[in-house]
Swiss-Prot record:
Gene3D superfamilies: Small outer capsid protein Soc. InterPro entries: Soc, Soc_sf. It comes from Escherichia phage RB69. It is found in: Virion. This is Small outer capsid protein. HAMAP family: SOC_T4. One of its GO terms (cellular component) is viral capsid, decoration. Pfam families: Soc. Homotrimer. Interacts with the major capsid protein; three soc molecules associate with each interface between the major capsid protein facets. Belongs to the Tevenvirinae Soc family.
Length: 78
């Protein structure tokens, strides 16, 4: 699949006397999807004000576990 993922971040505080500078970057979709393990995953994201699904992850450790599970192969039931 061609095209680009375009990401814009904004400068924001990062602790006492520090900040993360905003930046703009365009990444070829293939590189982005491979690095984020979404290649061939029929992956979709969309912003919303409220959670769209009943499973809601609220901390980073839980997200790492859930994210890994999203891409863990299991036997095909038939």
């Amino acid at each position: 699949m061609g095209g680009y993922v375009n990401i814009k971040t904004f400068t924001h505080p990062a602790g006492e006397g520090k900040e993360v500078k905003g930046m703009e970057v365009s990444v070829p979709f293939e590189i982005y999807s491979n690095e984020h393990r979404i290649a061939d995953a029929h992956y979709q994201t969309f912003p919303s004000e409220k959670a769209a699904y009943t499973t809601v992850v609220t901390d980073a450790a839980d997200w790492r576990t859930k994210n890994a599970a999203m891409f863990t192969p299991t036997p095909v039931s038939g």
